[in-house]
């Protein structure tokens, strides 16, 4: 099976634009021979959608756009995994899940909901989402796959000295027979993040002896910056496919021979910080719809960065 890692730059709340973006990437993936294209966490709503999730009309429109995306992508003959939200249907607890949806043949055929909801640092997901209590592997092509959402795959007891959560979704899915891990993410950037991710997921790949497909969001959404830097690994924890940093990208990997396309020209830490800040400023202006800006230069380091 050929899997396309679709590293997209979603705009929070722009359901129509985000759906069109994913359809365009799905078309590119199909033309490149992919059987499956994987998008980041909450790629339909944009991340983080925050209080938009409290609007019933937004939830209605999200489901409508998801169904339309499934129908529009049907002629491409490529399966899609994308991030969305799902109503729980329960009168108790939070009303929605953070979900990964599988689209095939014009229909939504499977949903996996996020189990581990971060509430530290920049995250406040437990304010909006209900945690999933169960999960199951699914058959994608000729592979039994584990589908996880960001934090779900960041809790390997073999790596962390002290874990934030008692459950390990990856361990549970591997025990249930999953032979490949697909992880969709909206993982913000900080200095050293690429090396940290690689180390964590290499340990997970070796621990469970499974290849990993890790797809991350790219772009700036208000104060959060996402570097992308998506990758695929073999069971030895070696990177076999990799996407660019700080820009949209589409790369393919093959589960049969565990090969893929690589982007190895990554910036050093200093250049990465500059690219992250430039991307964040550029996206803030573009996504807010500003036609022009006034730059005030006072002579400090902030002014120097703005001028650069």
Predicted segments — roles?
Residues 1-298, 302-308:
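Enzyme catalytic cores with a strong preference for nitrogen-chemistry domains
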């Amino acid at each position: 099976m050929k899997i396309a890692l679709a590293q997209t730059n979603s705009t929070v709340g722009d359901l129509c634009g985000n759906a069109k973006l994913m359809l365009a990437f799905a078309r590119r993936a199909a033309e490149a021979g992919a059987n499956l294209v994987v998008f980041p966490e909450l790629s339909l709503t944009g991340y983080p959608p925050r209080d938009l999730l409290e609007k019933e009309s937004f939830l209605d429109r999200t489901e409508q756009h998801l169904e339309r995306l499934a129908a529009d992508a049907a002629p491409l003959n490529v399966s899609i995994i994308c991030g969305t939200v799902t109503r729980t249907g329960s009168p108790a607890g939070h009303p929605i899940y953070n979900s990964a949806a599988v689209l095939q043949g014009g229909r939504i055929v499977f949903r996996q909901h996020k189990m581990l909801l971060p509430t530290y640092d920049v995250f406040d997901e437990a304010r909006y989402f209900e945690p999933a209590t169960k999960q199951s592997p699914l058959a994608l092509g000729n592979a039994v796959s584990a589908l996880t959402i960001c934090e779900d795959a960041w809790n390997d007891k073999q790596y962390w000295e002290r874990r934030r959560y008692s459950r390990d979704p990856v361990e549970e899915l591997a025990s249930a027979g999953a032979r490949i891990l697909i992880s969709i993410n909206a993982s913000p950037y900080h200095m050293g993040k690429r090396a940290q991710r690689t180390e964590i997921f290499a340990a997970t790949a070796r621990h469970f002896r499974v290849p990993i497909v890790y797809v991350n969001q790219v772009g700036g959404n208000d104060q959060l910056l996402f570097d992308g830097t998506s990758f695929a690994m073999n069971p030895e924890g070696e990177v076999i496919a990799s996407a660019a940093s700080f820009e949209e990208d589409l790369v393919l990997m093959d589960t049969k021979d565990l090969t893929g396309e690589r982007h190895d020209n990554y910036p050093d830490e200093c250049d990465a910080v500059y690219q992250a800040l430039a991307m964040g400023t550029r996206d803030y202006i573009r996504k807010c719809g500003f036609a022009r800006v006034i730059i005030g230069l006072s002579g400090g380091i902030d002014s120097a960065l703005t001028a650069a």
